[in-house]
C-alpha cells in the first residue's frame, strides 16, 4: 500500500512539474495568457517580471509586445533547477533574446530605483518567499512601477498568508491607485477551483490595476 501511495505521489508531482514546464503546453501557458490579458498596456517601454523562474512569462510578454524590453529577476534557489542560463537559452529558442534580460534578484528588496518600469508582473512567486509579509512584497513590487504604469500580480493568496486582500486592494485605491481589482484566477485560468487545488493553487487571485 505504501509503495502504491508513493507511486501515485510521484506521478502527481511529475504531472505538476510538466504543467509548469517551459513550452510544455501545460496549464501554466493558459495562466500566463490570462495574466497578460488583464493588462491595459500599449506595448511600449519596460516590463519587469518578479520571480521569472524558467523565464516562461517573461518570454511570453516579449512575444506579446514586440516593442517592449522585458526584465526577469529571480533568486533561483536549488528547488526548481532554474537558472539565468536556462532563461537565456529559452529566450533564444523563442527568438526574443535581444529584448529579454535576466538577473538575480530578491523580491523583498528589488535592485531598481522607484518608478523604473511601465509594467510589473508576477506569477506564483510571493508565497514561496519564506517568512515574508506578503503585502509588503506586493508593495515592494509596486514601488518600482512608474506612475501611470500597470500591474498584474498573480499568486495563491491564501488568507492565512496574505491576510485581508480586499482590504489591501482598498488601501491601494486610497493611495491613488486606479482600476484596482482582484480576479479569481482559480476559476478563470484553471476552469474550476477543484482543478486549481489539484496543483495546490486553489486560492489563486490576480491583483491588477494602474499606479
Regions found by a protein language model. Name each.
Residues 108-120:
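A short acidic, Gly/Pro-enriched loop at the edge of an enzyme's catalytic core
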Residues 65, 129-131, 145-147:
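Helix-to-beta-strand junctions that scaffold the AdoMet/dcAdoMet cofactor pocket
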Residues 148-155:
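Conserved beta-strand signature within the Rossmann-like core of class I S-adenosyl-L-methionine
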Residues 54:
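Conserved SAM/SAH-binding loop
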Residues 176, 189-211:
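Core SAM-dependent methyltransferase catalytic element
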Residues 135-147:
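A short glycine-rich, Lys/Arg-flanked "PGG" loop and its adjoining helix->strand segment in the class I
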Residues 10-34:
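Class I SAM-dependent methyltransferase Rossmann-like catalytic core
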Residues 48, 58, 63-108:
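Class I SAM-dependent methyltransferase SAM/SAH-binding core
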Amino acid at each position: 500500500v505504501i509503495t502504491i501511495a508513493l507511486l501515485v505521489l510521484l506521478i502527481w508531482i511529475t504531472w505538476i512539474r510538466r504543467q509548469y514546464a517551459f513550452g510544455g503546453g501545460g496549464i501554466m501557458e493558459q495562466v500566463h495568457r490570462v495574466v497578460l490579458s488583464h493588462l491595459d498596456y500599449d506595448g511600449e517601454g519596460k516590463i519587469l517580471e518578479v520571480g521569472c523562474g524558467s523565464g516562461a512569462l517573461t518570454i511570453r510578454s516579449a512575444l506579446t509586445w514586440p516593442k517592449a524590453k522585458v526584465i526577469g529577476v529571480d533568486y533561483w534557489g536549488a528547488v526548481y533547477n532554474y537558472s539565468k542560463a536556462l532563461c537565456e537559452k529559452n529566450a533564444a529558442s523563442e527568438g526574443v533574446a535581444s529584448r529579454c534580460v535576466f538577473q538575480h534578484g530578491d523580491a523583498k528588496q528589488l535592485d531598481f530605483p522607484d518608478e523604473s518600469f511601465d509594467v510589473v508582473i508576477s506569477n506564483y512567486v510571493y508565497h514561496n518567499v519564506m517568512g515574508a509579509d506578503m503585502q509588503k512584497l506586493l508593495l515592494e513590487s509596486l514601488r518600482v512601477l512608474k506612475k501611470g504604469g500597470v500591474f498584474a500580480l498573480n499568486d495563491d493568496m491564501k488568507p492565512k498568508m496574505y491576510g485581508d486582500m480586499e482590504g489591501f486592494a482598498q488601501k491601494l485605491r486610497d493611495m491613488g491607485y486606479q482600476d484596482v481589482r482582484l480576479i479569481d484566477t482559480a476559476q478563470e485560468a484553471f476552469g474550476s477551483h477543484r482543478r486549481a487545488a489539484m496543483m495546490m493553487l486553489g486560492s489563486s487571485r490576480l491583483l491588477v490595476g494602474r499606479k
